[in-house]
A protein has these predicted regions:
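Short alpha-helical Gxxx[C/S/T] motif in the catalytic ATP-binding
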Residues: 140, 144
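Short alpha-helical segment of the dimerization/phosphotransfer core of two-component systems
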Residues: 1-5
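Conserved catalytic submotifs in the C-terminal HATPase_c
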Residues: 26-31, 52-62
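Short helix N-cap motif at coil->helix boundaries in the Bergerat
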Residues: 32, 114-122
């Protein structure tokens, strides 16, 4: 309960800073392949995860100009949410350069329970929880949307009930 309350306070502070335009963004060049490999190492050492968290094989090396801390916040939110709703199968992080655009598309795909069609459009709204049994504040995905929009990208989800979900976002790529 204490952990959930601290997370709620932290999330509300982040949201207020985003709305006020005072959330700090520290921009720098980032090798996204190494960055994603580092994220995977953090999940490799967690023994209590219900399913494997994998990085798609054969991903190319790209550099983007971004805020590493905020990008990590979004990806780990996607993975942690997937872990809450995936009992069998796996969770996969991947990225690719979108054709005919200057964007990298990141995605976290799970083999979890999926999201009911009537709830898909609401997942990035504030205080939305998809069920009553999972821990969380209902603010994480709303914060993710604000971060990605600030970084110049878009965010979305594709889901099939009983099959799984793919949470994705785009990020500008200048080569």
């Amino acid at each position: 309960m204490k952990e959930l309350l601290l997370q709620l306070i932290s999330d509300i502070l982040d949201l207020s800073k985003i709305e006020a335009g005072t959330l700090d963004f520290t921009m720098d060049h980032l090798d996204i392949k190494s960055f994603c490999e580092d994220i995977m190492r953090n999940y490799d050492i967690k023994k209590d995860k219900p399913v494997p968290v994998l990085l798609a094989p054969g991903l190319p090396e790209y550099y983007i100009y971004t805020d590493k801390k905020r990008l990590m916040q979004v990806i780990t939110n996607f993975i942690n949410n997937a872990l809450k709703f995936t009992e069998t199968g796996q969770i996969t992080l991947e990225y690719h350069l979108k054709e005919n655009t200057n964007e990298i598309k990141f995605s976290v795909t799970d083999t979890g329970m999926g999201i009911a069609p009537e709830k898909v459009d609401k997942v990035f709204d504030r205080f939305v929880k998809l069920n009553s049994f999972s821990k969380g504040t209902g603010l994480g995905l709303s914060i993710c949307r604000s971060i990605i929009e600030h970084l110049g990208g878009t965010i979305g989800v594709e889901s099939k009930l009983g099959i799984g979900s793919r949470f994705w976002f785009t990020h500008p790529y200048t080569g």
